[in-house]
């Protein structure tokens, strides 16, 4: 297996970035497009070839390209790793990434920064592929920081808008908070294991069954902090909704399908650490469950179509954390895959709607589009049913597997199951709310005059021009990727159809070598909290009880999803006056949720304002202007004073020189007489 040349996979996208980044401004648009698409297509073909040939790996394949850092006893190699987990991530990143690159040809076709957009997209692919291929935590961190940089650049793509620039800075800073945890975890790994290589760290843990708790809990919680920042979980989730200021293809690729799932990938990659710490697992599951529910309630009240999907993304990432937190890593990763399909499709379909309406994103100004843009309608319908959890679509399979694994995991897991089930109902409600408001009823564009005629990609329309705007279907470059993703939403669930429902759960068996630790001769240690909580059985996949239980839970979940659909149908199709009446009746609750629980305002008062105060009045006013500027001014004045004195001495008058010499001679004689010179070692 020496012919894999894994380093070539991220090489092509970075070449595309360099070519378009350096010369794209002078290239014709067709050449920019060709460079970007080739840079996305070649890695996809490379990955397809590798997966076809090496999907049956029983041990990770590590491809080292020499020592990268050597500092004393610590050595870090520039190495890539291939196993089933990295294969899954490679397929998602390159496959969905290629489709979104194709979609962007039509969506971004009229943009002035067309070349810059594709350069940044290729740069993101390079760093994301580096992240998932890395064989050690240090190289993973390089990719981790790189995707954050690409995210910042693409969120702020419309840099002339203050909202986009501020959103980019917000995302960058919140992610840096999480990255502190990642860095501290690496320091602990070096201090305790002397290495950052996955194989060495996990091998050391696997060979020592007595090692659990303590240091592993600390490392697991610090890694979790990094994952929480990157994957937008409580308390660092607030950057993701604002990230919708970027172009819609960016929202689909980076802030839905790939980058935001990096935290889930890291937890699955480090599963051996989490399996040895019940506290770390409990924390992962608790954060995921709480985030899923909180974000779902926020999504119910949003009117911007992209922000609804943003909160939905935060919520679905919470499901993935829940899956990993109950040690059902295969289920969590499978939901990562299916989510990439249906959430990317939802964003692309939303982009098609926005493109059709000349930049409109407010759902209150939409309606009646299902007959005017039928391909967009039917593809988005597939995604809505998938995320809502209706069988046999992929979202039903992956989400229900997580809920089932939580239910059978422990007593605490049943609490997580109940909250996850409630979240599923809310998800169905707000997704069908989006569906009805966007595609059904009459067009509300004229009636909704206060809806800003805002444009998301430099399209400035007057109200009259917008009303006259010809509603038409998007170009084929946008519709073909959407259609492919819709097909995947329908059929991908078969890959992980549970055995308890009559399937083979092929995906779980495929991923098992990478998340079971079998190649390390490793068996998860059964650790339990004193309360008999979540750690009762920290196995990678909970044992399956009788099939009847899984069937019953699947039926319950489907009924809950159906109830959410029925509620949305009643409120946004049958009786459209109900939302306004309920809002008036429960105004306090509505205001709380509509304002997102004022979390941003609380952070602003408790964190941002004190930091700005310290920066402006302590660091800037006192330290910068007082100490640094004042010290510099004092030094300058002192030097100027000595210079003036020296200038007076250097007068050119011989009598003046004689006077100064006489004065200094007298001073020297006095010093000798009183013995002052002995204090300075002068004899």
Briefly describe each language-model feature range.
Residues 1-5, 11, 22-119, 191-212, ...:
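Transmembrane helix-loop-helix hairpins at membrane boundaries of multipass inner-membrane proteins
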Residues 38-54, 178-188, 380-388, 481-506, ...:
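Hydrophobic alpha-helical membrane-insertion segments
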Residues 1-11, 27-34, 74-92, 130-143, ...:
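Membrane-entry segments of alpha-helical transmembrane domains in multi-pass membrane proteins
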Residues 44, 343, 425-437, 560-580:
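Hydrophobic alpha-helical membrane-embedded segments
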Residues 72-75, 81-84, 498-559, 569-683:
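Aromatic-capped, Gly/Pro-kinked transmembrane alpha-helices
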Residues 29-42, 169-179, 371-380, 472-487, ...:
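Alpha-helical transmembrane segments and their helix-start/interface "positive-inside/aromatic belt" motifs
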Residues 99-143, 149-470, 494:
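Hydrophobic transmembrane alpha-helices and their helix-loop junctions in integral membrane proteins
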Residues 21, 25, 44-58, 98, ...:
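Transmembrane helix-loop junctions and nearby membrane-interface residues
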């Amino acid at each position: 297996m020496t012919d894999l040349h894994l380093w070539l996979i991220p090489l092509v996208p970075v070449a595309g970035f360099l070519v378009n980044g350096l010369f794209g401004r002078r290239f014709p648009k067709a050449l920019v497009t060709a460079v970007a698409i080739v840079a996305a297509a070649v890695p996809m073909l490379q990955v397809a070839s590798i997966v076809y040939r090496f999907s049956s790996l029983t041990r990770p394949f590590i491809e080292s390209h020499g020592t990268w850092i050597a500092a004393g006893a610590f050595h870090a190699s520039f190495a890539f790793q291939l196993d089933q987990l990295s294969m899954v991530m490679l397929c998602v990143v390159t496959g969905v990434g290629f489709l979104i690159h194709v979609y962007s040809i039509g969506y971004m076709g009229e943009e002035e920064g067309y070349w810059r957009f594709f350069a940044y997209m290729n740069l993101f692919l390079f760093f994301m592929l580096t992240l998932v291929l890395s064989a050690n935590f240090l190289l993973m961190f390089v990719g981790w920081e790189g995707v954050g940089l690409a995210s910042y650049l693409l969120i702020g793509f419309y840099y002339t808008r203050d909202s986009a620039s501020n959103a980019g800075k917000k995302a960058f800073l919140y992610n840096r908070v999480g990255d502190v945890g990642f860095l501290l975890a690496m320091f602990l790994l070096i201090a305790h294991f002397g290495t950052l290589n996955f194989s060495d760290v996990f091998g050391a843990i696997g060979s020592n069954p007595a090692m659990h708790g303590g240091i592993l809990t600390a490392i697991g919680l610090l890694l979790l902090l990094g994952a929480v920042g990157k994957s937008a979980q409580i308390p660092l989730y607030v950057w993701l909704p604002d990230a919708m200021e970027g172009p819609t293809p960016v929202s689909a690729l980076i802030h839905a399908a790939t980058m935001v799932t990096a935290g889930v990938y890291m937890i699955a990659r480090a599963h051996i650490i989490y399996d040895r710490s019940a506290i770390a697992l409990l924390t992962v599951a608790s954060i995921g469950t709480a985030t899923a529910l909180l974000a779902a309630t926020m999504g119910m009240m949003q009117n911007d179509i992209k922000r609804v999907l943003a909160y939905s993304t935060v919520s679905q990432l919470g499901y993935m954390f829940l899956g990993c937190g109950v040690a059902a890593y295969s289920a969590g990763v499978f939901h990562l895959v299916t989510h990439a399909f249906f959430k990317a499709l939802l964003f692309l379909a939303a982009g098609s709607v926005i493109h059709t309406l000349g930049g409109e994103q407010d759902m209150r100004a939409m309606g009646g589009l299902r007959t005017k843009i039928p391909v967009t309608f039917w593809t988005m319908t597939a995604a809505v049913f998938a995320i809502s959890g209706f069988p046999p679509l992929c979202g039903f399979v992956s989400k229900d597997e997580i809920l089932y694994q939580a239910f059978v995991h422990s007593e605490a897991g049943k609490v997580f199951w109940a909250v996850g089930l409630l979240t599923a109902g809310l998800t169905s409600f707000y997704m069908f709310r989006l569906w009805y408001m966007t595609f059904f009823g009459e067009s509300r564009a004229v009636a909704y005059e206060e809806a800003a005629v805002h444009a998301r990609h430099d399209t400035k329309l007057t109200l009259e021009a917008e009303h006259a705007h010809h509603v038409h279907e998007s170009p084929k470059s946008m519709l073909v990727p959407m259609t492919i993703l819709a097909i995947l939403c329908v059929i991908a669930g078969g890959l992980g159809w549970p055995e308890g429902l009559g399937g083979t759960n092929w995906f779980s068996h495929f991923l098992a070598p990478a998340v079971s630790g079998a190649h390390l001769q490793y068996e998860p240690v059964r650790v339990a909290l004193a309360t008999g909580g979540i750690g009762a059985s920290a196995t990678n996949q909970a044992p399956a009880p009788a099939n009847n239980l899984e069937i019953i839970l699947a039926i319950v979940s489907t009924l809950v999803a159906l109830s959410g659909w029925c509620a949305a149908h009643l409120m946004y199709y049958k009786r459209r006056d109900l939302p306004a009446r309920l809002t008036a009746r429960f105004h306090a609750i509505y205001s709380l949720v509509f304002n997102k629980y004022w979390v941003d305002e609380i952070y602003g008062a408790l964190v941002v304002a004190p930091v700005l105060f310290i920066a402006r009045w302590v660091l800037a006013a006192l330290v910068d202007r007082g100490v640094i500027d004042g010290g510099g001014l004092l030094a300058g004045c002192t030097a100027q004073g000595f210079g003036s004195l020296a200038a007076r001495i250097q007068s050119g008058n011989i009598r003046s020189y004689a006077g100064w010499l006489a004065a200094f001679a007298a001073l020297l004689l006095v010093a000798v007489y009183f013995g002052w010179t002995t204090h300075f070692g002068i004899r």
